[in-house]
Amino acid sequence: MELKGTKTQKNLETAFAGESQARNKYTYFASKAKKEGYNQIAAIFEETAANEKEHAKIWYKLLNGGSVSDTLTNLKDAANGENYEWTDMYDQFAKEAREEGFNDIATLFEEVGKIEKEHEERYRKLIANIEGGLVFSKDKDMIWQCANCGHIVVGKKAPEKCPVCDHPQGYFQVKAENY
């Protein structure tokens, strides 16, 4: 059966949005409970947030052909979403907030829009890395670090597997020092 255009599609979209928002809200509630010294309550909020994430994933998958797409497709989707947010959505929201006299909120929309632009640029670079075969291979020697055990390798390419902990190449990343 075709889902597109049905009430069920609309209901799935609403369920996905509701579960996604609940997850975030419960995460915020957990943080507040923890700060107030209610560790058990924080843990219950965190557990419920994890449940809501899984509920949202059920609805998301049903809306998207039964699965989550491959990483390259997901990066392209994410980049396009971030582009919309900084070029259209937040720009429009800022204009409307300013027209209504909410200058502080307008400024926040503009500043978040700048962050969304950075997100898009980061995703576009990752897309180029995948398409160019440059995720685990570079043109010059790099310091590669295993994210599991911390093993360091210097070279143009990350090893197929870590010689220390045996984790696959996917655990290697270019070591970044920002300290």
Briefly describe each language-model feature range:
Residues 1-179:
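Non-heme di-metal
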